[in-house]
Design a protein with these regions (language model features):
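N-terminal, polar/charged subdomain of small-to-medium soluble alpha/beta proteins
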Residues: 8-13, 63, 92-93
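ABC ATPase NBD coupling module
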Residues: 69-73
């Protein structure tokens, strides 16, 4: 699984902005309408939320096409999953990796 430290960032009003300090347990999924991989990842997170209510928060779903900067950076990689501003995965999501990032904090 490819992981990359993206720095502390969150999406507010469709823009990428730094966070001070990091928000613990924040999940952002960058998606695109009509993307079957996006639907699979959002569905997986919803299922994991039901199974692990105390661990998995409600994700923030962001449309990559709503902002030119997002589209140019992430348009070819959706879905893109961040936990606390750290890129966890794109295209697919491994449940164990996701739960570990929420439980232990995201890592490289």
């Amino acid at each position: 699984m490819w992981r990359h430290q993206h720095g502390m960032a969150a999406l507010r009003s469709g823009e990428l902005r730094p966070l001070d300090p990091p928000v613990e347990g924040r999940v952002i999924i960058v998606t695109r309408q009509g993307c079957h991989l996006c639907d699979e990842v959002v569905g997986l997170v919803a299922r994991l939320r039901q199974e692990h209510r105390d661990l998995v928060p409600e994700p923030m779903i962001v449309d990559v096409d709503a902002n030119e900067d997002l589209r140019s950076r992430w348009g070819d990689h959706v879905p893109v999953i961040f936990v606390d501003g750290t890129l966890i995965s794109y295209w697919t999501l491994d449940a164990d990796t996701f739960l570990s990032a929420l439980r232990d904090g995201p890592s490289l």
